[in-house]
């Protein structure tokens, strides 16, 4: 079960823009991430590689946690992301992340957002 302090540290790393570093530091080796109903990606190394590839397509990433809840091993975070592609196109969207933690590390995460609502 994550402490509030641990969750706040995780959020701070993501908000700093170090998304791949957050995965390296706060996810279990066998962690999984799932976007909406897509098949999950599994394994911390896979998750880090995917995140680095996504970030490489961006010139700027803004991440802000609007609220977060901890209930035992379960965490919910409401995120606002603003992604600026290298072409200058800006995409902004709201996302809810549901996480399951093992101690102070995330082992399962699922993201919920409306892809049609990604504003360009």
Enumerate the language-model features and the residues they cover.
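Short, aromatic-enriched amphipathic alpha-helices that serve as compact interaction elements
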Residues: 1-18
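Short beta-strand edge/turn micro-motifs at domain boundaries
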Residues: 94-120
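Hydrophobic beta-strand positions in extracellular immunoglobulin-like domains
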Residues: 81-83, 101
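Short, cysteine-centered beta-strand-loop-beta hairpins and adjacent loop/turn segments enriched
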Residues: 57, 83-92
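Short, surface-exposed coil-to-beta transition loops
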Residues: 61-64, 78, 91-97
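A short, polar/proline- and glycine-enriched secondary-structure boundary/capping micro-motif
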Residues: 45, 87-90, 118-120
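A solvent-exposed, acidic/Ser-Thr-rich amphipathic alpha-helical stretch
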Residues: 6, 20-73
